[in-house]
Amino acid sequence: MAFFNVFKAVLCAYFISVVFGHGITLKPHQRECFYENLRNNDQMSVTYQTNVGGDQLVSMSIYNPAGQIMHQEVPNSMAQYSFTVKNPGKYMYCFYNDALDGESKEVLFNVHGVIYISDEDLDANNPLLGKVRQLHDTISKVKHEQEYFVARERIHRNTAESTNDRVKWWSILQTVILVSVCVFQIFYLKRLFEVKRVV
């Protein structure tokens, strides 16, 4: 029984995976930064998508512990960047609203990290652990893709509803204009055929 408890503890430690889902609102020209303490061979992935606001273009930058830019994303409505840590320390990732349109933007982002534990810490002869780790990684990737598609679906649904509203109001306006023109033509033609008598 003690073997199973130790096995569970080792398995949990081996597959520590951290996932965060966040949403922030960036005002024009605002920069919002977040920090992660990472060790050698840890893996980190940042995915973001703008949901609401103007042209929906946001920049993302990732800085290493020395404060140097590792990656800079051009203004985009959605992007993803993954990397494996070579230098341990505090990594910073920032989102910036360039505000080319002067509007606030809502940014949804996920941070996914896999904490690396070396094979020396585990029983390297156990093939089951390798398969479980593979399965865990695959399930995590599927989960993140699903979160990404949910966010995209929300944006597309909002766009479709907005388009439907515009089409509805345009149709109502066309109907009002058509009825007005018909009424005008009826009265105009009626006046044209009236007999004018001289008394």
UniProtKB/Swiss-Prot annotation:
One Pfam family per UniProt: EMP24_GP25L
InterPro entries registered for this protein in UniProt: Emp24-like, GOLD_dom, GOLD_dom_sf
Biological process terms in GO annotation: endoplasmic reticulum to Golgi vesicle-mediated transport; Golgi organization; intracellular protein transport; protein retention in ER lumen
Lumenal side: 22-168
UniProt keyword Transmembrane present: yes
Membrane topology according to the record: Single-pass type I membrane protein
Positions on the Cytoplasmic side per record topology: 190-199
Subcellular location: Endoplasmic reticulum membrane; Golgi apparatus membrane
Coiled-coil portions: none
Biological role: Constituent of COPII-coated endoplasmic reticulum-derived transport vesicles. Required for efficient transport of a subset of secretory proteins to the Golgi.
Official protein name in the record: Endosomal protein P24B
Organism: Schizosaccharomyces pombe (strain 972 / ATCC 24843) (Fission yeast)
Taxonomic path: Eukaryota, Fungi, Dikarya, Ascomycota, Taphrinomycotina
